[in-house]
């Protein structure tokens, strides 16, 4: 049975939705969890500690171990303080789940510097700084699990939306970071993977049937990636409606012109072979 007894987890953005489901499941299976959430509104403004507090209360009432953290992780310092909170309160850090995100439905032509900066801070910089702060402790322990969050809206052309340019940027950047950290942490027992979830959260912004797209149907996949039983890195696990699959990239056989320098016309003539379709 997969358990997390004696382990410590941070789940960013875990006051609601997917993050809350992850935090509850990890705590139910023995982990001590830092429930991180500043309780901001959909537009990223405001502050409400009750959002994280409610999940902590739910966990502790059920007999689990959890503490809230309200740090603003849009800066390196905030990320460092979040990691330090887990270590100072529980003495170690085993699991980092980079779940916090932000969506702005803004086409390329309408993107502003302020909007792009916020996307970069939350979707790219925060996972980077949090991982940087967590790495020394995980290396010292010779154990760690880091999970990033990506999206089919970024990975696949057929699911892309023109108003999600910034969102797609952030979600693909996390996959590059996943691969680099998977190599960096391999010798020290640090495994790094990603989840690509679809769930009915406030960010989805569309109505679904009550029994569809529940965050609880995604959480088991994240729990596996966070466990000792998951001893691989570089996996992108797609999860929705209790359906789980891995997203994989393949390189076509292509053509090989040897030492010759071929023409663009030759590329055009053999395009179907190069693309494999």
Summary of predicted features, one role per range:
Residues 147-173, 178-179, 183-186, 197-211:
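Catalytic loop of short-chain dehydrogenase/reductase
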Residues 3-34:
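Canonical Rossmann dinucleotide-binding motif of NAD(H)/NADP(H)-dependent dehydrogenases/reductases
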Residues 194, 210-277:
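C-terminal helical subdomain
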């Amino acid at each position: 049975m997969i358990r997390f007894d004696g382990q410590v987890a941070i789940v960013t953005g875990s006051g609601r939705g997917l993050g809350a489901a992850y935090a509850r499941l990890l705590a139910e299976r023995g982990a001590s969890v830092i429930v991180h959430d500043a309780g901001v509104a959909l537009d990223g403004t405001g502050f409400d500690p009750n959002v994280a507090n409610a999940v902590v209360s739910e966990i502790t009432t059920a007999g689990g171990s959890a503490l809230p953290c309200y740090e603003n992780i849009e800066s390196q310092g905030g990320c460092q303080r979040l990691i330090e909170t887990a270590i100072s309160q529980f003495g170690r850090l085993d699991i980092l789940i980079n779940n916090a995100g932000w969506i702005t439905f803004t086409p390329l032509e309408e993107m502003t510097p302020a909007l792009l900066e916020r996307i970069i801070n939350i979707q790219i910089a925060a996972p980077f700084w949090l991982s940087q702060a967590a790495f020394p402790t995980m290396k010292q322990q010779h154990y760690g699990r880091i999970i990033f969050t990506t999206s089919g809206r970024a990975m696949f052309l057929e699911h892309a939306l023109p108003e999600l340019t910034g969102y797609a940027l952030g979600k693909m950047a996390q996959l590059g970071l996943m691969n680099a950290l998977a190599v960096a942490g391999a010798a020290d027992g640090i495994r790094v993977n990603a989840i690509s979830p679809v769930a009915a959260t406030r960010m989805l912004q569309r109505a679904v049937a009550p029994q569809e797209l529940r965050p609880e149907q995604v959480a088991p996949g994240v729990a596996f990636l966070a466990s000792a039983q998951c001893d691989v890195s570089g996996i992108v696990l797609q999860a929705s409606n209790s359906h789980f699959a891995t997203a994989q990239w393949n390189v076509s056989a292509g053509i090989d012109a040897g030492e010759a320098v071929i023409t663009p016309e030759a590329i055009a003539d053999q395009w179907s072979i190069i693309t494999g379709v």
